[in-house]
Amino acid sequence: MSKIIGIDLGTTNSAVAVLEGGEAKIIANPEGNRTTPSVVSFKNGEIQVGEVAKRQAVTNPNTISSIKRHMGEAGYKVDVEGKSYTPQEVSAMILQYLKGFAEDYLGEKVEKAVITVPAYFNDAQRQATKDAGKIAGLEVERIVNEPTAAALAYGLDKTDKDEKILVFDLGGGTFDVSILELGDGVFDVLSTAGDNNLGGDDFDNKIIDYMVAEFKKENGIDLANDKMALQRLKDAAEKAKKDLSGVTSTQISLPFITAGEAGPLHLEMNLTRAKFDELTSDLVERTKVPVRQALKDAGLNPSEIDEVILVGGSTRIPAVVEAVRKETNKEPNKSVNPDEVVAMGAAIQGGVITGDVKDVVLLDVTPLSLGIETMGGVFTKLIDRNTTIPTSKSQVFSTAADNQPAVDIHVLQGERPMAADNKTLGRFQLTDIPAAPRGVPQIEVSFDIDKNGIVNVRAKDLGTQKEQTITIKSSSGLSDDEIERMVKDAEANAEADKQRKEEVDLRNDADALLFTVDKTLKELEGKVDAEEVKKAEDARDELKAAIEANDIEQMKAKRDSLNEIVQNLTVKLYEQAAQQQAQENPEAAQGGADDVVDADFEEVNGDDK
């Protein structure tokens, strides 16, 4: 069975891992880094992903970051260079890049992946992630919750222990808390809670707002209206946040940030950890609520938790670590790398699927309650949150009016009592209900949640046995035709990227050859026929013309032709050198027979030694 890679598709950074020799191994990107910025940039039709895209964010307005925050969002698109892209398509570009360098590392084609999502992602967001994988040319074998994947990586070598662990996962854009019970190779999720709009980006934004306010106070200029300045502020804020995890004070220096009437202006500021903690105290406070909720849902006290695992780069913030310490009365476990552990867990789950990892069972839960809208706009739950998946549940409903010919099934996800306050997953209709007084028809509504947390709903008239089934497609969901088109676009982009690389390699080859030719012709001056030199010079000029005309086919032909001429000239040069040496030293040319000593070799046996 082919390898299944594990992908942590993050808000700010992504990572890819694979199972080798029973152990999960992170695959480094072409720059040698173990995580890749989840950034995509567009320039003159060329798509770039990762480090190179992030580096040009200041100067290139067509750079997209943190697209994960918009996954599953109805109608959301980004317009770049005259084209519109859905969050699924942008995410697919990141996945395609990760897939590409994973293939280079493995030396084989990769077609299957396990992709992680925040535990608190709803159905629409999970479906969008699966679609992104499909567009990138990946068969998504499983969608795994990030904290669960982290627990899998942490606990794989501890299957003989019985432990209750709390995973605190604060990433770039999302926050999850999951509580799991580990024992005999079973990873049983007891509860999960979270906030899909809380992450490292929010901590950065607090620093940005502070810098903008201070600069305005000093200079009367609002940097919030200057796109290029804002991007520089974002980079500086991220760096300052990271610095303050290790030191208590950091200097922010941004020369020529903007210009005033008197000339250029610079931003110079000292930010202390105490000030940073003050600016972000409300965010740290927000992390405590899901911790308490998860403990309550699991029916546990903090004292019953054996280990606290920190996941996500934002858990390096000292105030966050302190908050976790206080809430759980535990020293967080530092044995896992918060940036890599999720991708490693995904790779392990891939190994479970292929059978390479044995005696491990993963029991995950649905993060939000599921149900339908009933009379009076009430949300009637069929499946409660934190129910182990896969699962299914049925309930019988009836009509609200006499002779009602059809019922509308409005499927929702959430925790609020009224339907309007919850997230709509989809709507469908069961028609041709025979005329009968209200309350007589028996309509059975069944919910089915698969192992990826994706929902199927069925409505059946028990009188006529007529039924209607729907796989939930949210308002942001893509049709099969749309996905097919996007897959073709993604393949075309990959082909275009490959062609572009070949063109660059060809141009580099040609440039190197021109340099070699000039050097060789200089060495051959006066040593070979002028006609031979002229032939080489003509071929060189023809190659230069092909490069200037950007004619790929001509470039290939002229390069090969010039290469042949240069090789012939080089051979002649060596022949001449050999002749010259022979003339200068005739004895050496004759083989120098007198200087050669004949040697007799005799085999020595152990006895003769």
UniProtKB/Swiss-Prot annotation:
Modified residues (Phosphothreonine): 174
Keyword Transmembrane: no
CDD domains listed in its UniProt record: ASKHA_NBD_HSP70_DnaK-like
Region described as Disordered: spans on this chain: 577-609
InterPro entries: ATPase_NBD, Chaperone_DnaK, Heat_shock_70_CS, HSP70_C_sf, HSP70_peptide-bd_sf, Hsp_70_fam
Keywords: ATP-binding, Chaperone, Nucleotide-binding, Phosphoprotein, Stress response
Job of this protein: Acts as a chaperone.
Protein name: Chaperone protein DnaK
Organism: Enterococcus faecalis (strain ATCC 700802 / V583)
Gene: dnaK
